[in-house]
Every structure is written in structure tokens, then in C-alpha cells.
């Protein structure tokens, strides 16, 4: 009896000494060793088969920043577009905008149901397109859009995401409408300057003042010149016209030289 008691005490002391000889830092609270933990964190990513339906697939959550607009398309296709404003969940003051394009059945669903400031989750394929491709003096300039395949409403968005949409000093509807209209106009000018050759320039052949000075070739959106335009728009237009004049002069000079060759 005493022999077994002494042997048990010896085993307990030995086990205690062995366990105490290992630094506690080599193990985590869940019993996982530091070596295994490091290997698990930095292991090589798994391989997967190429799935073409998932190439450039994206899902974005944000707010409808513009009313749904119908695109000028052929009789066999129906397309609409809008702008999605995506906010950083950790910093509501940071956001970006991206164009959404919807076609056929999806386009009809969106134009029937989506409204300005709707909080939505869209899934689709990210596409790129070249801007100012007709401008020989600019380098490759890409922009991005999402060809939408699925749209879902987002229920009960977090309050910190909506804080910029809720004004502390309530405004009248008229003031809101004016502010929204100005914001849309400024954004349209930014779209224009990003790719001015996607717009018809009607400044020299307007039949009446109500006609727009610039009209988008696909979406039909319009811009008018007015006396209260911001200075930066006026300066950008002057540079745009100057560059076009220089291009026309260079083209004329090359054509004349070719006549003598």
C-alpha cells in the first residue's frame, strides 16, 4: 500500500516538474502550441479550380446615389444604369462611387423598384473600360463598372452608416431638392471631364437655348453652360477647347504635309 502511494506521489511530482519546465508562452489559452499556431497562420493557400462564372465577381453594399436612368440601346436590348455610393464601415466619412449597369429583366426590375438612397446589396461582374480613348494626348485611363446580376435590399442599416444622411438641422424639401440637384450636376461635370469624347458637343449648333450644350451619347444625360458654374469647370472647359484646337491644327498640318509627299 505504501509502495503504491509513494510511486503515485513520484509520478505526480515528475509530471509537475516536466510541465513547469516548458515556458507558458509556447502554448495558447486553447492549448494550441506556438509552433502549430504559426504553421497554421502562415500555411500555403489552398488551390482551387478555375471557375469562369466567378472571374471578377464582386458584391458591394451601398446606397443608390442617382435615380435609375435608361440607356440609349438598340431595340433588342434594354439597359439602365445608376451610381452606387459605397461607404467605409469603419469611417463613414470615406466613400467611393461606382457605376452599375443592368440589362433586360434585371433592368426592368431595378427601374420598377429601386429609388434614390435605397440601401442595397448588388452582386455581379466587375468590368473596366477605357476613358478618353479618342484623345491621342492622354494615356490609358481606365474606369470601372459592375454588370449587375442580383440585387437585394439591405434591412436596418447601422446608424453610423446613415449618420451623414440624417441632418441635425432638418431642411425643407425644396432645399433638399436644390442641394441634390447641384450635387448631381457637379458629379455629371466630373463624369464629362473623365471622358469628354463620350458626349456630343452641341455648343456650336444649338437650335434653341433649351437644348443642352453637352449630351451623353449612350445615356442621354445633358449639361448646360450657365453663368454660375464653378470656376474649376470653366477652367477645365478652356483647357479642353485649347487641346482640341491644338489637335485640329496638328491634324491640318499633317494633312498638308502629306499632300507634298
Swiss-Prot record:
One of its GO terms (biological process) is negative regulation of DNA recombination. Residues 55-155 form the SSB domain. Its main location: mitochondrion. GO terms for cellular component: apoplast; mitochondrion. One of its GO terms (molecular function) is single-stranded DNA binding. Keywords: DNA-binding, Mitochondrion, Transit peptide. It is found in: Mitochondrion. Residues 189-238 are annotated as: PDF region. It comes from the Eukaryota. Residues 1-28 form a transit peptide. Disruption phenotype: Severe leaf variegation, distortion and partial sterility. Regulates mitochondrial DNA recombination. Represses homologous recombination, preventing mitochondrial genome instability and unbalanced transmission of alternative mtDNA configurations. Binds preferentially single-stranded DNA. Does not bind to RNA. This is Protein OSB1, mitochondrial. It comes from Arabidopsis thaliana (Mouse-ear cress).
